[in-house]
Amino acid sequence: MNNTYLIEVDRIEPNGDVVTITERRTLCATKSNKGRDRQLNNLVNRIDEELKYYQVPYKRYTVSVV
């Protein structure tokens, strides 16, 4: 069974409006809870790097396990 994560980004549009963008990512299953926590932490770091790389103006973002 795979691990599914829900990513929500509150993006700030050029006119000042805040729009929520959602995405689901499915990653391979882990054998332990510690592995799942590590996978979640790595995903949060990857999302942060992607937002900085693409210079997306955002108010906040959340990553949760579905």
For every predicted segment, state its role.
Residues 6, 33, 37, 41-44:
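Short linear motifs centered on Gly/Pro in flexible linkers and helix caps
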Residues 13, 29, 47-49:
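Residue-level detector of functional hotspots within protein domains
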Residues 8-12, 25-27, 58, 63:
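Assembly/interface hotspot detector across virion components, adhesins/toxins, and nucleic-acid enzymes
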Residues 14-16, 28, 54:
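Short linear/disordered segments characteristic of secreted peptide precursors
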Residues 2-22:
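Short aromatic-glycine-(Arg/Gly/Cys) micro-motifs in beta-strand/loop hairpins
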Residues 19-38:
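A short, exposed loop/beta-hairpin motif centered on an aromatic-Gly-Thr core
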Residues 41, 45-66:
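Short, mixed-charge low-complexity intrinsically disordered segments
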